[in-house]
């Protein structure tokens, strides 16, 4: 009757092993999937950077989610090389084409002086609060810690800023800056879900702060009860990883764009009109900026405000939530953000369509020869673009430094 020794010897014949040195070479190529098949307590004590946790006890259930590419070289390791050998055999039976078990496991890797790390440490309450994130391979513990360390600035605590702030706070984005000089009005409550009836007359920043801190005490709310302007935008935007654009006027959008390019801070742009909404991501010098898309604002009669034209109350929820999604993708470096892509939503049709956007080489802000090198009179520019251009001949400029 076969013994365990016989069983394991048979497995070793069917799998491929590699030394820690060889595995390190494979990791440098970036062409492998790296899986740690140890248990949770072992993983928490330290693991190889770039590895995903796929404990052998859940291997069959979790493998296809956490190690999704069956045709890619997959390297597994455990503490000493036994469990990873068995796991490699299992993955081969599940259709993985090139599976390698690291001989000697994590112990040999660590003893030979190779790099390793400990995962982010969460409090018991945080582990419970973010448990659904921790289960997602693209987020996990490292991603959740990245969110907790991130800083997002929201322009406006209104229709778009409300749902975006709600979901960024619930996701655990560590610092949310909110810029808004307005107060809560009864007409806001049809769509601005950060605010409540008893807060009518209260500043929107104060109301938003109360709501978000009650939702998630992990999140630091920084309020700016001031209108965004050329005089304060450099001070406000400094230190933030990205900006959510919930502005409701063109001067602020152009100002934000120019500051975004100057500081190289991505902007997740959203806009709404009655039953229609649009979302895109302006990532400086990796895609078009707002001026590439809109060299000048439309006449006021073609772009009325929500107060003038109205808006379906739930529409900002759809668009603002997409903005929050794009922000999280950018912060985590996952997926395909809407850079160079303009997503349009029609609520009446229940349809989405996408338009591809390109950088304008003649763009006065991010083009090859920019003519706008400082903040301008945005009110004057938006009131009469042609007159403004006539009064401001291009000056000699230098390209923003890389």
Locate the predicted segments by residue.
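Glycine-rich, N-terminal phosphate-binding loop of Rossmann-like dinucleotide-binding domains
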Residues: 37, 78, 246-248
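Adenine nucleotide-associated cytosolic modules
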Residues: 61, 70-72, 93, 111, ...
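Short beta-strand "acidic-cap" motif of Rossmann-like dinucleotide-binding folds
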Residues: 34-36, 101, 175-180
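Rhodanese-like catalytic fold shared by cysteine-dependent sulfurtransferases
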Residues: 1-33, 40-75, 79-145, 188, ...
